[in-house]
């Protein structure tokens, strides 16, 4: 009879070896403190920008109070257009609420600042010797932020997961801005580590384990093989762009070896290969969602595991989209992944995927036919094909949920073969990137180009702000031009054009203009002022607010000059196309203040209903438009 000790500790011959625990990122104490301070600085900046916090002057800085009115945190900041707060990370401190017996503030460990009980510890530490804690700030300010008890644990988890992602990046070597300015798109993409400029919890990837992050997170840059499944064709949707038929789709997206091997797997399973289509799957998704969650489909052989593909792929910033590193000129593959990040489960809906190629073809056509967009070097990256499996019980139930977004994929053309000789590319996120020494990549591009800061900024706006505005003004069409959906075309660091991508879910036609059959879902008719938010919120507040401050605070370009150049670029468009400006006014004095973090705090796992995004949005009054100052005198200056 085996005793209890033997049962608890089986021999090496019989026990299953467990993986070694993953070690925490190797940050020294000061780097760990700096990480906390950077998160806190962004938190106080963006939460103040969204008017959830109301900073009060206090000495050389500002304090924010909890729901009782007691000051809890102190920071120093400069203020900029669009109510941007540029918070000094080294100044952030949690306030010691203690008082001495005489009712005066205690000065233990730091210098007192005006106000009863307000003590700011000196030297970068709190009174107990620790660094400030971003999660503690959320706890202190929970009621002020409107964060419910139900959502609090989810947001704290998301915030910690974001910090884990940041810590992993900071523990690894990284190139300088000057080095990155001479790098190609895949390398630039790997080292863009700022995350979304507005969201505080911006790269949580909740559900992706620590060891899994080492394998599949974009910053790891580890090449991986995708898992391939065969899905019964009668239970699947396959949509192809105008350039493809079934034969060309298979030839383009599978190697000859994969085609032969996958067909052999199906024949060996007693199945007819012609009755199946193939789906690329993230290895994490197969292990965590499909095999355990869709086992009946596997047992029925409605889904058949084909194995790994021949090519190696690398995850991009969006986590679920892959670049083919074996042949970077081949299409990107976008896969479903049941991980929560920045307010959404990163799955893919077969129903949504079905229309993607048609939407992409339509958008590609209207931009190619537009002389102005061609002049500006704008090109839509077409989504050549999509596939989705709908034979599972969740689809049969008729209930729409995240469980119906588990198995689908999309192929999108790569920008690399579309670059002209001498051009290189980088995600728009690069203009907001700074290296470990605080040097902006934008500054390094300016230096490489040999242009002045004014000339470079004007060129950037000519291929970003103005084309997005032109699409809205001339085509009643709004895209989501955030920093991942735009890829800049650069020549020696100088902007000469842009690729637009990933627009099937993030494009909207805002009028009753005719649309091709099958893509009516992208129509979202709104009033003129709400239409303007496609520029005011998504471009001015979402991207250019941060860029203007970055260039200003690093001494590259004064922010007043930045906004003057932006106004001038739009004013010249208005002169050329006055007929497009009759209904919309991008120079209006103010616009509705749409708030992203308010959405995330309301529900960290489902910020908006993608089928009804407009009604999901949250507003906090109005923002003054920095373009309005130059309404009547934008002309002249930099050309």
Regions found by a protein language model. Give the residues of each.
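Hydrophobic residue at the +6 position relative to the catalytic HRD Asp in the kinase catalytic loop
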Residues: 486-488
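Nucleotide/phosphate-binding site architecture used for ATP/NTP-dependent chemistry
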Residues: 2-462, 491-639
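Catalytic-loop of the protein kinase fold
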Residues: 476-482
């Amino acid at each position: 009879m085996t005793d209890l000790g033997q049962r608890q500790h089986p021999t090496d011959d019989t026990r299953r070896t467990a993986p070694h625990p993953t070690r925490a990122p190797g940050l020294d104490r000061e780097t760990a403190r700096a990480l906390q301070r950077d998160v806190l600085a962004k938190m106080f900046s963006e939460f103040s920008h969204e008017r959830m916090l109301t900073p009060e002057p206090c000495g050389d800085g500002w304090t924010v109070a909890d729901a009782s009115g007691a000051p809890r945190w102190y920071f120093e900041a400069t203020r900029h257009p669009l109510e941007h707060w540029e918070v000094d990370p080294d100044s952030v401190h949690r306030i010691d609420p203690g008082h001495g017996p005489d009712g005066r503030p205690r000065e233990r460990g730091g210098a007192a600042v005006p106000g009863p009980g307000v003590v700011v510890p000196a030297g970068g530490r709190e009174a107990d010797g620790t660094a400030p804690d971003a999660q503690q700030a959320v706890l202190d300010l929970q009621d002020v932020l409107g964060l419910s008890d139900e959502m609090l644990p989810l947001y704290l988890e998301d915030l910690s997961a974001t910090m884990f992602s940041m810590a992993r990046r900071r523990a690894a070597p990284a190139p300088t801005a000057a080095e990155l300015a001479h790098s190609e798109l895949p390398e630039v993409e790997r080292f863009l580590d700022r995350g979304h400029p507005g969201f505080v919890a911006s790269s949580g990837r909740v559900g992706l384990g620590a060891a899994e992050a080492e394998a599949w997170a974009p910053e790891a840059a580890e090449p991986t093989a995708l898992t391939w499944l065969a899905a019964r064709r009668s239970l699947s949707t396959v949509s192809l762009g105008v350039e493809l038929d079934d034969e060309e789709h298979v030839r383009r997206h599978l190697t000859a070896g994969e085609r032969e091997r996958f067909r052999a797997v199906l024949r060996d399973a007693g199945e007819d290969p012609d009755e199946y289509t193939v789906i690329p799957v993230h290895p994490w998704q197969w292990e965590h969602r499909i095999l355990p969650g869709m086992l009946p489909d596997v047992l029925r052989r409605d889904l058949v595991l084909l194995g790994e593909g021949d090519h190696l792929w690398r995850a991009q910033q969006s986590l679920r989209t892959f670049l083919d590193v074996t042949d970077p000129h081949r299409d990107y593959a976008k896969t479903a992944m049941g991980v929560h990040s920045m307010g959404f489960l990163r799955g893919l809906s077969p129903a949504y995927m079905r229309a993607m190629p048609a939407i992409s073809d339509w958008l590609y056509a209207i931009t190619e036919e537009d002389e102005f967009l061609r002049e500006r070097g704008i090109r839509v990256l077409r989504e050549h094909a999509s596939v989705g499996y709908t034979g599972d019980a969740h689809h049969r139930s008729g209930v729409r949920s995240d469980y119906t977004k588990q198995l689908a994929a999309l192929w999108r053309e790569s920008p690399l073969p579309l670059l002209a000789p001498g051009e290189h590319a980088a995600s728009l996120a690069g203009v907001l990137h700074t290296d470990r020494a605080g040097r902006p990549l934008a500054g390094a591009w300016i230096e490489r180009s040999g242009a002045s800061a004014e000339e470079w900024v004007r060129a950037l706006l000519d291929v970003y702000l103005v084309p997005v505005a032109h699409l809205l003004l001339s085509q009643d069409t709004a895209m989501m031009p955030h920093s991942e959906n735009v890829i800049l075309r650069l020549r020696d660091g100088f902007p000469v054009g842009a690729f637009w991508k990933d627009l099937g879910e993030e494009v909207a036609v805002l009028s009753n203009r005719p649309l091709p059959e099958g893509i009516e879902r992208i129509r979202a008719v709104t009033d003129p002022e709400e239409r303007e938010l496609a520029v005011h919120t998504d471009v001015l507040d979402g991207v250019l607010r941060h860029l203007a401050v970055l260039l200003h605070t690093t001494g590259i370009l004064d922010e007043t000059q930045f906004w003057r150049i932006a106004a001038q670029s739009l004013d010249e468009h208005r002169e050329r196309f006055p007929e497009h400006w009759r209904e919309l006014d991008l120079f209006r004095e103010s616009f509705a203040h749409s708030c992203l973090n308010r959405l995330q705090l309301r529900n960290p796992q489902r910020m908006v209903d993608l089928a009804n995004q407009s009604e999901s949005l949250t507003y906090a009054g109005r923002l003054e438009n920095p373009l309005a100052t130059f309404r009547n005198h934008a002309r002249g200056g930099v050309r």
